[in-house]
Amino acid sequence: MIHDDDPNAPGAPHDDATAAPASATRAAPAAGDDDDANPLHLRRIRSFVTRAGRVSTGQRRAIDELGPRFVIPYGSAQPDWDAIFGRRAPRVLEIGFGMGASTAEIAALRPGDDFIGVEVHEPGVGALLKLIGEQQLSNIRIIQHDAVEVLAQMIAPDSLDGVHIFFPDPWHKARHHKRRLIQPPFVAQLAAHLKPGAYLHCATDWQNYAEQMLEVLSADPSLENTAQNYAPRPGYRPVTKFERRGLRLGHGVWDLVFRKKHAG
């Protein structure tokens, strides 16, 4: 997810990085974790770690007033997204949008595209709904659920024009790297839901995770890198306050943009 400017928001940066994920907070490993028994880990991968968050009065009002229109309940059937958005347009899935400021900015910058934002934490959902109302955005819908399950159940194969995964939890301790979202089985799942020629854009402020992302994405046979290694930041991805602060301190940010190969 992209980091937003509320220092008390889910995903506010930790001491040694410029940013932190809203949908995947640094948390202690769950007791009884049996990832090692499953070499693919796909059933164990989650796009978030459960944690509490305070919903403000404004966020609650936005949820109550705008949620019925803009929040799509999770279900096991694939919705008619054209009917939901009221048009047929390029469709982008964003996994973990945090407090939603950057999501709203991208949607405003690209009014011809439709965005499905997935975020489990209610304060972030309320914050994005508030921005949707304030900016009168019609090209965003929200699913408050685990992105792994949303992708498997609610998104048709070969249907997405793009996927954004900005600043996911780096799980910086080596023994926790297996919990990182960007792993071969999940990348294969993402690629299967992209249209040929569609893009997957990841960003991180952890060099070790950037290196792993590059390795994993490069190894997927259905994807190709749009750059030699790391990509320049695309103009549509905003630079957040925390990212600017980190850059001033000499911290790096790495963008990776891959495309799904055309058949043949």
Swiss-Prot record:
What is the uppermost EC class here?
transferase
Keyword Methyltransferase among UniProt keywords: yes
Q: Which reaction does it catalyse?
A: guanosine(46) in tRNA + S-adenosyl-L-methionine = N(7)-methylguanosine(46) in tRNA + S-adenosyl-L-homocysteine
Enzyme Commission numbers on file:
2.1.1.33
Start-end of Low complexity biased regions:
18-31
Residues given in the record as S-adenosyl-L-methionine binding sites: E94, E119, D146, D169
Keyword tRNA processing carried by entry: yes
Region of interest (Disordered), residue spans = 1-39
Q: Where does substrate bind?
A: K173, D205, T240, K241, F242, E243
Active-site residues annotated for this sequence: D169
SUPFAM superfamilies, sorted: S-adenosyl-L-methionine-dependent methyltransferases (SSF53335)
Q: Kindly tell me the pathway this chain contributes to.
A: tRNA modification; N(7)-methylguanine-tRNA biosynthesis
CC annotations in GO? tRNA methyltransferase complex
The highest taxon in the source lineage is: Bacteria
Q: Which Pfam families match?
A: Methyltransf_4
Tell me, what is one Gene Ontology molecular-function annotation carried by this entry? tRNA (guanine(46)-N7)-methyltransferase activity
Name the UniProt key words of this record, in alphabetical order. Answer: Methyltransferase, S-adenosyl-L-methionine, Transferase, tRNA processing
Role according to the record: Catalyzes the formation of N(7)-methylguanine at position 46 (m7G46) in tRNA.
State the family it belongs to: Belongs to the class I-like SAM-binding methyltransferase superfamily. TrmB family.
Q: What is this protein called?
A: tRNA (guanine-N(7)-)-methyltransferase
Species assigned in the record: Burkholderia mallei (strain ATCC 23344)
Organism phylogeny: Bacteria, Pseudomonadati, Pseudomonadota, Betaproteobacteria, Burkholderiales
